[in-house]
UniProtKB/Swiss-Prot annotation:
Keywords: Cell inner membrane, Cell membrane, Membrane, Transmembrane, Transmembrane helix, Transport
Record carries keyword Transmembrane helix: yes
Annotated function: Part of the ABC transporter complex BtuCDF involved in vitamin B12 import. Involved in the translocation of the substrate across the membrane.
Source organism per UniProt: Vibrio vulnificus (strain CMCP6)
Protein name: Vitamin B12 import system permease protein BtuC
Similarity comment text for this entry: Belongs to the binding-protein-dependent transport system permease family. FecCD subfamily.
Length: 331
């Protein structure tokens, strides 16, 4: 088979996988809207209560699951290229913790209860600060994979310590907000909160279109510059985009870990690392994973609803350990 035929075959495989993932997402979305404490049949007319349940509760929650999953997966894929580390992930590297810490600071320092817009801005600033710290240390100190993970874990522990301190100075309402962020949950998502989504979606689409630029960056800064990439400008734009996505995701659903690690890594293993296809596929796969996880979170127990962050950690942590062992064996 000639080179152009191989390339055409690979592109056809990417597109077929993208269509399959989209179909799976649509099926899971339909299932998501039907199942719950009250089953909504697609073959019968809905009562006024069922219609309100569908439109005001399940539909905004479904949209939240999809946009958060897509944002985290695409952020993880981009961060892995930016840091040159396949184990990079917003939750593991402490960036999500930085976003939650900034939201806690806003919660306690502002004289009134912050609006979703204020929480979103605080989360974006927190994510940006922690991303800059991590990228700056990685570049200045030439950190290895293990050391970069340790720095990320340390940043996460630091932010977690401050958030834990906040427990002891919070009233009942603030305590519920803190628990919501720490465990990761979209149970409180409503259309009012989707102002955050209006900010997130354009950035997500823009980042998904940066695949060719990321492919050039993977060749190294020198080769990327020779191919016409303004490396410095592109790097800062990517950092800002990642911070906005992570900040919005944390503001909407709290800290949800491992989506940005597991999804891009498994897709790279299965289909290769061509980012112009990997990024859109990561978005659909991340959305699919979070919708699937939230279905289980809502239905696994009869008496209670599990936090979404617990479900993604249960799925992602064993895969992360396997990836660490595999990375060690490769070296």
């Amino acid at each position: 088979m000639e080179l152009h035929q191989l390339i055409a075959h690979k592109e056809k495989r990417w597109r077929a996988t993208l269509l399959v993932m989209l179909a799976v997402l649509l099926v899971l979305s339909a299932l998501y809207l039907m199942v719950g404490e009250v089953f909504l049949s697609p073959f019968s007319s809905l009562s006024s209560f069922e219609h309100k349940l569908l439109v005001d509760l399940r539909l905004p929650r479904l949209v939240a699951a999809m946009v958060i999953g897509a944002a985290l997966a695409v952020s993880g894929a981009t961060l892995q290229v930016l840091l040159g580390n396949v184990l990079a992930e917003p939750g593991v590297l402490g960036i999500s913790g930085g976003a939650s810490l900034a939201m806690v600071i806003a919660l306690f320092l502002l004289p009134v209860m912050p609006t979703p817009t204020v929480f979103m801005l605080a989360a974006i600033i927190g994510a940006l600060v922690f991303t800059l710290i991590l990228v700056g240390m990685a570049r200045a100190m030439h950190l290895s994979t293990s050391r970069m993970l340790l720095v990320g874990v340390a940043l996460g522990i630091l932010s977690g310590a401050f958030v834990t301190w906040a427990f002891y100075f919070s009233d009942d309402l603030s305590l519920r907000q803190l628990m919501y962020w720490l465990m990761g949950s979209i149970g409180g998502a409503s259309w009012h909160h989707h102002l955050v989504t209006l900010v997130l979606l354009p950035v997500l689409v823009w980042l998904c279109l940066q695949g060719q630029t990321l492919d050039k960056l993977m060749l190294g800064e020198t080769h990327a510059a020779q191919l016409g990439v303004d490396v410095h400008k592109v790097r800062w734009r990517l950092i800002l985009a990642i911070s906005i996505l992570i900040g919005c995701a944390v503001a909407l659903g709290g800290i949800i870990s491992f989506v940005g690690l597991v999804v891009p890594h498994l897709l790279r293993m299965a289909f290769g690392s061509e980012n112009r296809f990997l990024l859109p596929l990561s978005a659909f796969a991340g959305a699919t994973l979070l919708v699937f996880s939230d279905i289980w979170a809502r239905t696994l127990l009869d008496s209670a609803e599990l936090p979404l962050g617990v479900m993604t950690t249960t799925i992602g942590a064993p895969i992360f350990i396997w990836m660490l062992i595999r990375s060690h064996d490769a070296h």
